[in-house]
Amino acid sequence: MKVGIIMGSKSDWPTMKLAAEMLDRFGVEYETKVVSAHRTPHLLAEYASTAKERGLKVIIAGAGGAAHLPGMAAAFTSLPVLGVPVQSRALSGLDSLYSIVQMPKGIAVGTLAIGEAGAANAGLLAAQILGTHDENIMAKVEAFRSEQTESVLANPNPAED
């Protein structure tokens, strides 16, 4: 495994699966797990503190509401932690964004956008991080970026379909 995708509850999976799909696109191995900062704090501590020895290189943590999962995961590991604020009914995920982005100096969490775009970009960013030491992954990331450019250039007029 290279990437761990964790989320506060199973209800976060529809959002977090976009991170998994992005990693699939680049052929990056990952594991998924529900780990609640509030309901299973000891499991979270064990998961994050053993992540490096289990072969993980990056952790993607998605959470809604109080969204303490990414910050607490970062507190227990020296690996990069990417935080995804999951969009919620209350406050549309803005509360989660503030929770994840406002980390104290010395405990870093790379915070992505709220919701599906954030989850997909977390997968992309994890692949880019891994790609700095894996030419195969980086080649796939670069091909993806080229495909995006080509799709825009192929359809420059929004009035045409």
Swiss-Prot record:
It catalyses: 5-carboxyamino-1-(5-phospho-D-ribosyl)imidazole + H(+) = 5-amino-1-(5-phospho-D-ribosyl)imidazole-4-carboxylate. One of its GO terms (molecular function) is 5-(carboxyamino)imidazole ribonucleotide mutase activity. InterPro entries: PurE_ClassI, PurE_dom, PurE_prokaryotes. Signal peptide: none annotated. One of its GO terms (biological process) is 'de novo' IMP biosynthetic process. The keyword Transcription regulation does not apply. SMART domains: AIRC. Pathway: Purine metabolism; IMP biosynthesis via de novo pathway; 5-amino-1-(5-phospho-D-ribosyl)imidazole-4-carboxylate from 5-amino-1-(5-phospho-D-ribosyl)imidazole (N5-CAIR route): step 2/2. Pfam families: AIRC. The keyword Plastid does not apply. Keywords: Isomerase, Purine biosynthesis. It is an enzyme of class 5 (isomerase). Its EC number is 5.4.99.18. Substrate binds at S9, D12, R39. Belongs to the AIR carboxylase family. Class I subfamily. Catalyzes the conversion of N5-carboxyaminoimidazole ribonucleotide (N5-CAIR) to 4-carboxy-5-aminoimidazole ribonucleotide (CAIR). This is N5-carboxyaminoimidazole ribonucleotide mutase. It comes from Vibrio vulnificus (strain YJ016). The lineage of its organism: Bacteria, Pseudomonadati, Pseudomonadota, Gammaproteobacteria, Vibrionales.
